[in-house]
């Protein structure tokens, strides 16, 4: 099936521009240097699957004219990946009397349920709450004829999910990739990887480390995401191999799912 991936956000947890920062990237006139928190939308066969609800989801949805979602997948529970959950309200209302399904690994699902009790506990059923249903995910999932396979990655000291779907994979927030996960990254047309900056970080990959991952996984094309203000878009792209680029907010890629 033909599918389209839209990069809703390509930035790090603080976004770019970063509050109070006077660096050149934060004051850049290049729109590619404006980076909201990391998320992608996958569309195929009239369906739409979102990966992560960032604090910028409302802005991202308005920018991309998102009017429909059929499922949401969560990579993990850090603030920059879940805090936009309440902004699912207007889209989730379109699912009534059904609820919009949200999928997360079991430990993440429990965390989300506890953090947003007003959404999930019956005693809080008042007002216009998001009409969503949280479902634990511990293996491959078929959504509307497409297979979404969790790809475990290491984020600091925590195991979280990336996802493979068809000929594409999206891995964000990783400091290491387990040996067993490389088997899930073979034969890719598109691979998204975390590349925060050049300087080492305890929970995120660097540009140099992600280039080594590209050399091993051998996708046709690779795109870096979760980018901080240390990496100017155009200048950094000039240093990368021809099949590797920084992603940017609003980027659209077609692939087979």
Task: Please report, for each region that a protein language model flagged, where it lies by residue.
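Binuclear metal-dependent hydrolase catalytic cores
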Residues: 1-171, 180, 237-256
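Cap/insert and terminal regions of metallo-dependent hydrolase folds
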Residues: 176-257
